[in-house]
């Protein structure tokens, strides 16, 4: 991820954050925030499903641009969800940086060990 990409995510997140107290009749994001957890989370599920379907379409000769558009929708709604739970893209970027260089197997083993330690085991 380039600094420019990170800046784009952070700028978009700032706009989303600014909608938290907004008028739900004037802003789609404000409306999602106003409807609460279930509406935000339902939207994530819908968008994730659309990504899966678009990816399958690409394998069947569909337009890759449709997949890119659906992933953009999912990322946008993930930013809304992060904001809704008082988190930011920086939190996710930090976690990805922490995992960088670890194999998936190593990362999963470390996560399980941390969970056992946190649960007193």
Swiss-Prot record:
A single GO BP: L-histidine biosynthetic process
Pathway terms, separated by semicolons: Amino-acid biosynthesis; L-histidine biosynthesis; L-histidine from 5-phospho-alpha-D-ribose 1-diphosphate: step 2/9
Keyword Cytoplasm included in the entry's annotation: yes
Alphabetical UniProt keywords: Amino-acid biosynthesis, ATP-binding, Cytoplasm, Histidine biosynthesis, Hydrolase, Nucleotide-binding
Organism superkingdom: Bacteria
Cited Pfam families: PRA-PH
Catalytic reaction(s) noted: 1-(5-phospho-beta-D-ribosyl)-ATP + H2O = 1-(5-phospho-beta-D-ribosyl)-5'-AMP + diphosphate + H(+)
UniProt-listed InterPro entries: HisE, PRib-ATP_PPHydrolase-like
E.C. number: 3.6.1.31
Major enzyme class: hydrolase
GO function term, MF aspect, one: ATP binding
Cell location: Cytoplasm
The keyword tRNA-binding is assigned to this record: no
Main location: cytoplasm
GO cellular component: cytoplasm
Stored NCBIfam families: histidine_hisI (TIGR03188), PRK00400.1-3 (NF001611)
Entry similarity comment: Belongs to the PRA-PH family.
Name of the protein in question: Phosphoribosyl-ATP pyrophosphatase
UniProt organism field: Burkholderia ambifaria (strain MC40-6)
């Amino acid at each position: 991820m380039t600094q420019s990409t990170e800046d784009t995510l952070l700028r978009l997140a700032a706009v989303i954050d600014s909608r938290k107290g907004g008028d739900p009749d004037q802003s789609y994001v404000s409306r999602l925030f106003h409807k609460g957890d279930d509406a935000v989370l339902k939207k994530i599920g819908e968008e994730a499903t659309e990504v899966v379907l678009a990816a399958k379409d690409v394998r069947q000769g569909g337009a890759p641009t449709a997949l890119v558009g659906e992933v953009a929708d999912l990322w946008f709604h993930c930013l809304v969800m992060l904001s809704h739970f008082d988190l930011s893209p920086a939190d996710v970027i930090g976690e990805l940086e922490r995992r960088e260089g670890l194999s998936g197997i190593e990362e999963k083993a470390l996560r399980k060990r941390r969970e056992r330690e946190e649960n007193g085991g």
